[in-house]
Amino acid sequence: MQRFRSLVLIAAFSAGAVLALVRLFERAATSGRSAQKQRGNQGRNAKRWVFKIAAFLLVAAFGGLLFVTSGIMPIKASSRHWAITAWFLNFAMRRSVVTHSLGTRVPALDDVALVAKGATHYEFGCRPCHGSPDFAQPAIAQQMTPPPPHLPWVVPQWQAKELFYIVKHGVKFTGMPAWPAQQRDDEVWAMVAFLQKLPNLTPEQYQELARGKKVSGAVIDELSGPNNPPQAVGESCARCHGLDGGGRGLSGFPILAGQRPTYLFASLLAYARGERHSGIMQPIAAGLSAQDMREIARYYANLAGLSSPRAVGAGLKPASTISSSFSGNRHDRRDASAIERGREIAMRGMPSQRLPACAACHGPSSTPRNPIYPQLAGQYAEYLALQITLFKKGSRGGTPYAHLMRLVASRLTPEQVHDVTRYYASLGSTTESPAQ
């Protein structure tokens, strides 16, 4: 009843407005008749056309308003787009992506760690709509309008820089979201690296990249013992960080085994609150309860570090065995000169640059340290270098002490970042007790 009254009022208002305009035009025409005779038929006809066009535009505007407010226009996804509408929207989207991606610099995308990092998030965040080599057409997503494309088929139509723009910014009116953390271009490029490999992956290769190697029950028993993995570890954490906490042997995923539980819990909390930016970790952490976070932190903290023979034997296969189709981009940890220079920075700092010693907060040290400071010994050099770079850019949040690292990172040169991260990577992750 209320809608009917609204329609009647709109119709009456529109009719009244049109009649008023017609009368106004008639008066104007009458008052200017003598002048029009002097100007001749050409001027009179031109003025009449102006009046007619103005009246038409006004009527069209009111008609459009009436059409929209009446609710007659269907918005149901089940009706699909008309063919001409679908073509126009697709054409406009493609031209926009091409234009806005101009000038984008594409980094190297062949690192297997980068590809695997994108693959694990694709499995969690993209596969339900876009499918995969082992899951062709998601039934629910196909009822969207427009339906999400099956990416293994359409990715070859796009350049890397265009894929970057789409993944980072999303697409309006399609259900395609923007990347949850706009500060993390490195994560977006990881997704692009994976997408470029996706069309040529077999179902088995996809499973291995996205979910890692399957671990036998005997290995799980040997690895965990009384420290049974919490449910959240199996559901969310293990596909990237492994049940052994070794990051699947890939620098794209940090080593969690032996890390300090206070730091792990604080990091998960920071991700969940959006205080540490990551389009990969934020959605996962946001779905965890505080109890889940504590259990995850306790589980990984109680695992032996990767320098332990038990952990090395039980861990997943290294990156070189994942697939011969991909080439890694690993740095040699045995660069003795870089490690020695890094040791000097870590243990003594650089007074001339007002750089404090890294060991004061991160070890190695025989004195107790703040338990919220992370342990770095044995961590992947590439992962540490990425975190320092993010701190430099102001794109890395974290625990309440994260602001201290922004200042330190801003004073490190690229060469010093290389050296100090190689030094920490060369150390065993059990150099000191996680409690210190």
Question: How would you label these PLM feature ranges?
Answer:
Residues 146-148, 186, 251, 291, ...:
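Extracytoplasmic
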Residues 290-293, 356, 360-436:
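C-terminal functional regions that serve as terminal interaction/effector modules
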Residues 2-10:
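Feature marks short, highly hydrophobic, charge-poor N-terminal signal-anchor/signal peptide-like helices
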Residues 15-28:
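Alpha-helical transmembrane segments
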Residues 132-133, 243, 364-365:
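Cys/His-rich metal-chelating microdomains
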Residues 32-33, 37-128, 132, 138-141, ...:
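Periplasmic c-type cytochrome electron-transfer domains
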Residues 137, 143-150, 175-178, 246-255, ...:
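A cross-kingdom feature marking solvent-exposed beta-strand/loop segments within repeated
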